[in-house]
């Protein structure tokens, strides 16, 4: 990275951390010293900092309690919408469906050539 690119990425990281309610001082701490919720939000910062067109998250709320889970999803969706990123959110937690305008239940799908549901 050039110095300018590095500065831009650092600035973008700080903006995302602020938007996701993370203190910039967390950058100085090892991830093992962060709460699970903080680790999840830092992972989202890392995923969004390069402004991807597509973000795929697999069970990002599995280790969070219901309050932290809903807060995390709201923060994630806010950032995804602001960045105009397509999000594929994978979860076994059906209660999260309320947060999304479209859901796909793969349990009800049949694989071509198969006679039984997957």
Can you describe what each PLM-predicted range is?
Residues 8-25:
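Conserved ABC ATPase "signature" region
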Residues 30-34, 38:
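Conserved ABC ATPase signature
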Residues 51:
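Conserved catalytic motifs of ABC-family nucleotide-binding domains
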